Design a protein with these regions (language model features):
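Inter-lobe coupling linker of SF2 helicases/translocases
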Residues: 5-18, 25, 45-184, 276, ...
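Short, well-ordered alpha-helix to beta-strand connector turns
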Residues: 14-18, 37, 223, 242-243
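Conserved helicase ATPase motor motifs in RecA-like P-loop NTPase domains
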Residues: 17-30, 38
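PAPS/PAP-binding and catalytic site of the sulfotransferase fold
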Residues: 29-41, 80-84, 121, 200
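Conserved RecA-like ASCE P-loop NTPase motor core of nucleic-acid helicases/translocases
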Residues: 186-193
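Non-catalytic, charged low-complexity extensions flanking SF2 helicase motor domains
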Residues: 273-275, 279-325
Length: 325
């Protein structure tokens, strides 16, 4: 990202390096390419400034008067960008070069009751649920609303005092079914919110994957239900020996974190078919998240677009035309 401190630090020392080889995952969108390619060629191909790159290859897409929420490529821009960077870039998929097992992706749908759905819909429409002083659940902007709705889809939500208010157990019921159908085979369960983890631990004999001992125990089959947060599932974390099934109890808008966690099991050395289960609450933001992941959309834009219409187009622009290589 052009806004990341890592990018700014690399930009300063890049002229000192005679040769640079960059390794990266799949960019979220074409806009993300500017920073990555810029570090390699110091702005020769896509321009020295993100504003110039944006003006050259993109048009405003979703906007509210002067505030631009997202951009779309100009006609022919995608092909032109790929042409410009083709001499210094190569795309390689592990499945094309390594002996990889089959990977199956499933959607496990759950439904809330009428009263639970009504509560969710009221939060989506009014951005607040009133329970009394210090107990209200409210959202001040699109990002906060998306966060609250995702929590409710999972089954619980924090109020304004930080207390957890339980909504339903639909996903936990579905997880129990998956555990039973696994017949003793280990499951790696991904969660996002702390209350997700707490509710899982309260109901199942699960264990966190945090330390080297946790990793070793998982890989020798000592942990039947392992909990992991996507942000902690970094590159180099090898879990493929301990199991081949992932359950996304809580989805993530981050395509990078999603792919990174799945790659802990779906990687070289995995001997079994990898099954990725996505628990999705029907009629909720879960469906928007899964769609965004499936089309490899820019996560921030997808999140804002999914809820923006409900709150009159409020969003933070937060962009600058002055960031350059």
């Amino acid at each position: 990202s052009s806004k990341a401190q890592r990018f700014k630090d690399l930009k300063k020392v890049r002229p000192m390096a005679k040769r640079v080889v960059g390794l990266t995952g799949t960019p979220g969108n074409l806009m993300d390419l500017w920073a990555e390619i810029g570090i390699l060629d110091m702005g020769q191909r896509l321009g020295r400034f993100i504003g110039g790159y944006r003006d050259r290859f993109f048009l405003p897409d979703k906007r509210n008067r002067e505030i631009i929420f997202s951009y779309k490529p100009r006609e022919g821009a995608e092909e032109k960008i790929y042409e410009l960077i083709s001499d210094i870039s190569i795309s390689m998929k592990a499945v094309d070069y390594l002996d990889m097992p089959e990977c199956i992706s499933n959607r496990v749908s759950v439904s809330m009751s009428e009263s639970e759905q009504a509560l969710y819909d009221r939060m989506a429409d009014e951005m607040i649920l009133e329970y009394g002083e210090g107990q209200d659940i409210d959202a001040v902007n699109a990002a906060a609303l998306s966060n609250k709705l995702q929590q409710m889809a999972n089954g619980a939500v924090y109020d304004e005092s930080g207390n957890v208010r339980n909504i339903h157990d639909r996903k936990l019921d579905a997880l129990e079914d998956l555990i039973e159908s696994a017949n003793g085979k280990p499951l790696l369960v991904a969660y996002w919110f702390k209350h997700d983890r707490e509710r899982i631990l309260k109901r199942f004999p699960a264990r966190d994957i945090n330390t080297k001992k946790d990793i070793d125990d998982w890989n020798v089959g000592k942990i039947p239900i392992a909990l992991i947060h996507p942000a902690s599932a970094g590159h180099g974390l090898n879990l493929q020996e301990g199991g081949s099934a992932i359950v996304w109890l809580s989805l993530t808008w981050s395509l990078e974190l999603y792919q990174q966690l799945n790659a802990r099991l779906y990687r070289q050395g995995q001997k079994h078919t990898v099954v990725i289960e996505h628990l999705v609450t029907d009629g909720t933001v879960d469906e928007d998240i899964l769609r965004a992941i499936e089309r490899k959309d820019n996560t921030q834009n997808a999140m804002i677009e999914a809820v923006k219409a409900r709150i009159g187009g409020m969003a933070d622009d937060g962009r600058s035309n002055d960031e350059g290589i």
